Amino acid sequence: MKYKNIKRGIFIERPNRFIAHVEIDSVTEICHVKNTGRCKELLIPGTVVYIQKSDNPKRKTGFDLISVIKGSRHINMDSQAPNKLVQEWMEKGNLFSGITLVKAESRYKNSRFDFYVETKEDKIFIEVKGVTLEENNIAMFPDAPTERGVRHIKELCDSLHDGYKAYIIFVIQMKDVDYFIPNETTHREFSDALKSAYRKGVNILALDCVVEEGFIEIEKQVEVRL
């Protein structure tokens, strides 16, 4: 997945969840933050960030904040990227063979899952989560409590009883992590729900990514520790 019109900047501040002030070519610009998570460990004043200039002259903000440098690690922050990456990954023949249908944003009961996939043998629901939180080479999710995430997990479990297969895919938007864990400290209920789902037969995968200036792509599967 490639981004056009990428520029380097220096993060100044984040007045609210939706915008950031970034210094670009010695000028302070207002950028749209494509991630409403806290990201407090990433967006630190003085941090190098990469932003994308918008092609839409009518937008209130002329740039999108795409990625950030944390130490020696390049981390993509675009919350829209994980779904696109998983779709690209499946279209390349990874994960499932014999796919006959891929439908995004598919409703089941009270939830809307990211993907519904059919193969010659199976009907599958997939929920995708983007991961930007890393500590000591360990990737974690979530970075803030997510009741919606808990509901999705429980309804994925329900789908098993109706004959579907179910997957939760954590897209780690960086590389070189050792393994993935649920962030029990931040949201114990999510962690417990994920462990319960695994015991019931929901497939839990974590995939890391190659991240470069203006580029991100799924690389390989990472160990999940529950």
Swiss-Prot record:
GO terms for molecular function: DNA binding. Gene3D superfamilies: 2.40.50.580, 3.40.1350.60. It holds the Pfam family SfsA. CDD domains: SfsA-like_bacterial (cd22359). It comes from the Bacteria. InterPro entries: SfsA, SfsA_C, SfsA_N. Coiled coil: none annotated. Belongs to the SfsA family. HAMAP family: SfsA (MF_00095). NCBIfam families: sfsA (TIGR00230). This is Sugar fermentation stimulation protein homolog.
